[in-house]
Regions:
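Transmembrane alpha-helical segments that serve as helix-helix packing and pore/cofactor-lining elements
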Residues: 27-36, 62-66, 90-97, 165-184, ...
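The cytoplasmic-loop to transmembrane-helix boundary for the fourth helix
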Residues: 91-150, 182-188
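Membrane-embedded alpha-helical segments of multi-pass membrane proteins
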Residues: 15-19, 71-82, 156-159, 215-220
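Internal transmembrane alpha-helix with an interfacial aromatic "cap," most often the third helix
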Residues: 20-28, 77-106, 162-169
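Helix-loop junctions on the outward
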Residues: 2, 48-75, 89-94, 118-139, ...
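Interfacial "cap-and-anchor" motif at the non-cytosolic start of specific transmembrane alpha-helices
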Residues: 6, 10, 36, 40-43, ...
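Hydrophobic transmembrane alpha-helical segments in integral membrane proteins
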Residues: 1-19, 149-157
Length: 231
């Protein structure tokens, strides 16, 4: 049973990456529409997260798992800032997206990625020798431990997501009725991976080497794309 669940998670994650890739292509073809360019970049990063996460789960040795985990961290830490960029663009706050603001928004993710890449040279993040395989509930998968910078990035992620959701809630209240359904769809699309990520982080139902968030982002890609291009 565990092997079937693991295969299903990997398959769902790969499908999520394919869906995000397709949505990125659709966004490119419609890049002149409002907020679609930001949506396209978000989809590119979501696809990268899904594919690298799949590769990490399927890694046969700790060194490969650790390497793919570095790419996972680059993609995952960039997803939330891009969500906020998309929300600001969608709600008509493009004027806030100055180079200074965008640089500040990526300050924490950039620091996190640099500390992750340079982990062999300091003790803030576990190095390559820390990764290994763990068997839990019949599932055997690689596990790469995390350090304090990962916790800081996680807190930053939830703060940025909270800001994005508050901006959408404000826009929902103030917008005309014709846009309210679309805004509700956009908000739902962002809530889906947020809830899944929190469940993965704070509950014991999943294997420590499995993150369901990339698979959930495939659902986000479908819902968000439908919401943007349907209305």
């Amino acid at each position: 049973m565990g092997a079937h669940i693991f295969s299903a998670v990997v398959g769902a994650t790969v499908v999520g990456g394919l869906i995000s890739s397709a949505m990125a292509l659709v966004a490119w073809r419609n890049r002149d529409r409002p907020a679609v360019a930001a949506f396209g970049w978000l989809m590119v990063v979501c696809a990268a997260w899904a594919f690298t996460s799949s590769a990490r789960m399927l890694s046969q040795d700790p060194a490969s798992a650790y390497l793919f985990d570095r790419f996972v961290r680059v993609a995952s830490s960039s997803t939330t800032p891009l969500i906020l960029v998309f929300v600001l663009s969608y709600t008509g706050r493009d004027a806030l997206l100055t180079p200074r603001f965008v640089g500040l928004l990526w300050l924490v993710p950039t620091g996190y990625v640099l500390l992750s890449i340079t982990a062999p040279f300091h003790a803030l993040e576990p190095g390559p020798g820390s990764s290994g395989s763990v068997t839990n509930a019949g599932i055997t998968a690689p596990v790469v431990p995390e350090g304090l910078p990962s916790d800081v990035d996680l807190v930053f992620t939830y703060v940025v997501l909270a800001v994005a959701l508050l901006l959408l809630a404000q826009f929902l209240v103030r917008s005309r009725a014709i846009y309210r359904l679309q805004t509700t769809v956009v908000t739902t699309a962002i809530l889906i991976p947020t809830i899944v990520n929190m469940a993965t982080q704070f509950s014991d139902f999943s294997h420590p080497g499995i993150d369901l968030t990339p698979a959930a982002l495939g659902v986000t890609a479908l819902v968000l794309g439908w919401g943007l291009f349907q209305y």
